[in-house]
Amino acid sequence: GIWYWRFRQADTHGTTQGEWSEPYHFEVPDETPVFVTPAFSEFQSRMPHSYPRLHCYLDPKIETARLNVKSHREYKMLTGRAQDALNTNYTTMNPNENTGTLCIHTQSLYDAWHLTQDDKYSDCMYRLLRQMLAYPISDALLFASNFASTDIAICYARIYDQLYNRLTPDERAAIEKLMMRVLRWYYPQHCGTQENHIFDNHFWQQNMRVIFQCALLLYDNTVYADEVLPMLEYYYELWTARAPASGFN
């Protein structure tokens, strides 16, 4: 049938602010497939509490994949990309200022270590982190653009996720603060905007995913849980509201 939709703002206590928008309408044909996305409470009950967790959906098959990884046709490409990172000398530069390359290298090292468990990849990630942390990130650099923010955030997030049990408390805290800077900057901007925006290319191409991943890493952190869990719920509900129409892509 024909559905009508309008919106207005409300604060965190549910107190409405401002007037209703003009009504919108759309039609749902009878032949439209029915799909009900899981409630956030169900998603939350299944969220992991251990690290690494960014690719927790692979956990049931990861051991089998590791046994067979060397026979996979893409194994040489996997290790070749990681070797590029191993061969790069970051000791004379600020890695945070070259996020294009840094993103590729942290992704390649993450994937290679996750599948091979070869410590040369995790050791390289750790050395890279030490160099990254040696250069404090200014707001001017971190928020130069929304892609710049999430490029930097995901580099730190991958290392945090993969090396969590190896990092010192100070190293963990430094990465957590960086991720929280990004979450606190963008979450207020997204609320009330993205759910009423037809399509924001940057948001759906990368930014939403990275921000969601940062929230997933911190949702059960004793320092940030109360602040981060509502953020995670917001992005989950926003994604599931849009996902069926876009094929979950």
Whereabouts are the PLM-identified features?
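Low-complexity, Pro/Ser/Thr- and charge-rich linker/hinge segments at domain boundaries
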Residues: 27-54
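Extracellular fibronectin type III
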Residues: 10-33
